[in-house]
C-alpha cells in the first residue's frame, strides 16, 4: 500500500517543482507550458491518491475531467504559441514585455 | 421723550446716510443738525426732570436675548449720571454738527460725514443709557466702529487709513478685556443687569476665585478687566498710542471723539461701576497709578509736539488721566464733573484749532503759524478762554473741577487717613499742571503771538471764520466760562444728593470734607505752578526763541527734546516689540509653516503627492514579464494562506499582514 505521507509529498513536491519551473524560467515559453502540464499532473495525482485513500470515485472523475481540460488547454496554449511565433518569430519569455505598466 | 433722545440721531443718521443722494448737502445738513439739536434740547429737559427733581427713569423696550439664566433686554436707564452724559454728548455733538456744516462745506462727501457723526452720537447715547452690560457693549463697539469710519473719513489718504485701523485695533485690545469682564460678571452674578450687579456686589466681597493655584479676589478681577477696557477707550498709558494718531480725521471729528464723547466712555464706565470698584482697594490703587502716570506722561509729551491738533490731543490724554485717578481716589462725582467741564473747553479748543487750520489753508504745523492775533481776534479770544479754562485759571470752568481734583490729592498729606498712595497722584498731578500750562501757552504763542512763519500767499487768505463756525465757539466759550461755576454746587457741593444711587462711595473712602481743611499754601500750589508755566512759556517764547529748534546747546537737552517729540518712543517700541513680531509670527509661522506648510502637507497637497509617488512605484512593478506576475500571484497566495493560518492565533498580526498582502496583490 502507498504510504500516505509519501504520496502527498510526491504530489506536492511535483507541484512545487512545476511552480518554480514556471517563474524561474526566463527563456523558453515551452518550458513554462510543460511546467503547467506538470502542475496538472501533480494535482490529478493528488486527486487520484485521495480518491483511493478515501475510497471515493469522485476524485478519479475529477482527474479524468482535469485530463481533458489539460489537453484542451495545452492545445489552445500551443495554438497561441504558434500564432505568437508567427508574428514575433521568437518565443523568449523575457522579450514579452509589451504590456509594461 | 427719553427714547427720542436716542433715536433722533439714529433717524438722522439713516436718512442722511441713505437719502443723502436725494436730499443733497443742504438738506442733509439741515435735517441731521435739526435731529441732534432737538435731541439735545430733549436731553436738557431730561436733565431737568431727572437730575434736578431727583428721580430715576427706567424704560423697558423689548427683550433681546433669552437663554436660560442669561437674559438681556433692550432697557434704558436714565439716572443723574446718564443725563449728565446725555447733556454733554448731545450738546457738544450738536455744536459740532453746526460747526461742520461750514467747516466741511467744500467736501464732496458731506452727507456721509453727517451720517457718521450722527451714528457716532447714537452709539454713544446707547452706551450711556444702557441698563445692562450687553447693550452697553453694543454702544462701546459701535463707538469704536464709528470712530473708525470718522477717522478714515478721507479714505484716500494713507495716513488716515493707518490711524483709523490703529484706533480700531488698539481699542479692540481694551474691548477684549472688557468682554472678559462681562463674562466674569455673568459667571459671578448670573446677570448682566446693572441693578442686579450693583445690589449684589457687597455679598461677593469675600468671594475668591482659584485660578492656576492663585486665589484671586473676584471683584478685583472684574474691575481689572473693566479697567483694561477703559484703558483702551480712554487712552490711558499703555494703550494711548491711538489717540494722537486719530488726529488724521477732520477737526470736528477730533472735537467730537477726543473731547466729549468717545474717550470719556472709559471714564464713564469707571464711574458707572463705582459700586463695584469701591470694594477693591487694589483696583483703586491701579486706577491712581495709571491715571496719574498718564496725566504726567501726556502733559510732558505735549510740550514738544509741533502739530497743533496733536498738542490738544495730548492734553486730552492728560486730562483723562486726571479723571481716572480721581476715580481711583473714590471721587467719582468730581471725575464726572471734570468730564463735563472738560468736554466744554476741549471741544472749544479743538473747534478753534479747526478754525485756525481752516484759515491758514490746512496747515497744521504750529511752527509755520504765528501772529494770527491780528487776523482772527475772535478765534484768539475763544482759544485763550479755552486755554485758561484748561489750565485751571481761577473762576473759569477748569478751576472748579481740575483744581478740586488736585486739592483732593493733597489729602495724602494727612498721614492718619491711611491713604498714602494718593501722594503718587498728588505729585504727578501737580507737576503736570505746570506742563499743561506750559504747552497750552506755547500753543497760544506759536499760533497767535509770535512773528509769522506763514507763506505770504496763505497769509493773504487768512480770514475769520464764518458765522456758523463762530456760533458754536461762542456757545462753548460761554460754557467754558460759566459751566463750572453753575453746576459746581449741584455736582460736587458738599452734601449734594444730586447723584443719588448712581454713584456709590464707601464712607471710609470719602474725603471731601477733609479736603476743605487743607492749609492754604497747599491749595495755592497748583495755581502758582500753572502761573509759573505761563511765565516760563512766555519767557521761552520772548527771550529764548531758539529753545525748541536749536536745542543742540546741550546734548542732554536735545536728547530729551527728541525723546519727547517722538512720544517717548512708545510707538517705536510697540512696533518693534509687539506689532512686528506678531506680524512675523502671522506670516512665517502661522501662514508659512502651519497653513501652507503642515496642514497642506498632511492635507490635499501631501495626499496627492503621496498617491502619485506610490502609483509610480506600483507602475514599476508591472514589468510586463509573465514570470514576475506569476511570482506576485504565488507570493500573494502563499502569504495569504499563511495569514489565514495565523489569523486563528493572533488577530492584530493578521490584519497587518492582510494589508501588506493586499498591497502586493494590487
From Swiss-Prot, chain A:
Its main location: mitochondrion. InterPro entries: NADH_UbQ_OxRdtase_chain4L/K, NUOK/Mnh_C1-like. It catalyses: a ubiquinone + NADH + 5 H(+)(in) = a ubiquinol + NAD(+) + 4 H(+)(out). It is a multi-pass membrane protein. GO terms for biological process: ATP synthesis coupled electron transport. It comes from the Eukaryota. It holds the Pfam family Oxidored_q2. Its EC number is 7.1.1.2. GO terms for cellular component: mitochondrial membrane; NADH dehydrogenase complex. Keywords: Electron transport, Membrane, Mitochondrion, NAD, Respiratory chain, Translocase, Transmembrane, Transmembrane helix, Transport, Ubiquinone. The chain crosses the membrane at residues 5-25, 29-49, 64-84. Coiled coil: none annotated. Core subunit of the mitochondrial membrane respiratory chain NADH dehydrogenase (Complex I) that is believed to belong to the minimal assembly required for catalysis. Complex I functions in the transfer of electrons from NADH to the respiratory chain. The immediate electron acceptor for the enzyme is believed to be ubiquinone. PANTHER family: NADH-UBIQUINONE OXIDOREDUCTASE CHAIN 4L (PTHR11434:SF16), NADH-UBIQUINONE OXIDOREDUCTASE SUBUNIT ND4L (PTHR11434). Belongs to the complex I subunit 4L family. This is NADH-ubiquinone oxidoreductase chain 4L. It comes from Chondrus crispus (Carrageen Irish moss). The gene is ND4L.
Swiss-Prot record, chain B:
Its EC number is 7.1.1.2. This is NADH-ubiquinone oxidoreductase chain 5. InterPro entries: NADH_DH_su5_C, NADHpl_OxRdtase_5_subgr, ND/Mrp_TM, NU5C-like, Proton_antipo_N. It is a multi-pass membrane protein. The keyword Transmembrane helix applies. One of its GO terms (molecular function) is NADH dehydrogenase (ubiquinone) activity. Signal peptide: none annotated. It comes from the Eukaryota. Pfam families: NADH5_C, Proton_antipo_M, Proton_antipo_N. The chain crosses the membrane at residues 3-23, 31-51, 59-78, 82-101, 119-139, 168-190, 211-231, 251-271, 283-303, 311-333, 337-357, 375-395, 421-441, 467-487, 524-544, 572-594, 629-649. Belongs to the complex I subunit 5 family. NCBIfam families: NDH_I_L, PRK06590.1. The keyword Transferase does not apply. GO terms for biological process: ATP synthesis coupled electron transport; electron transport coupled proton transport.
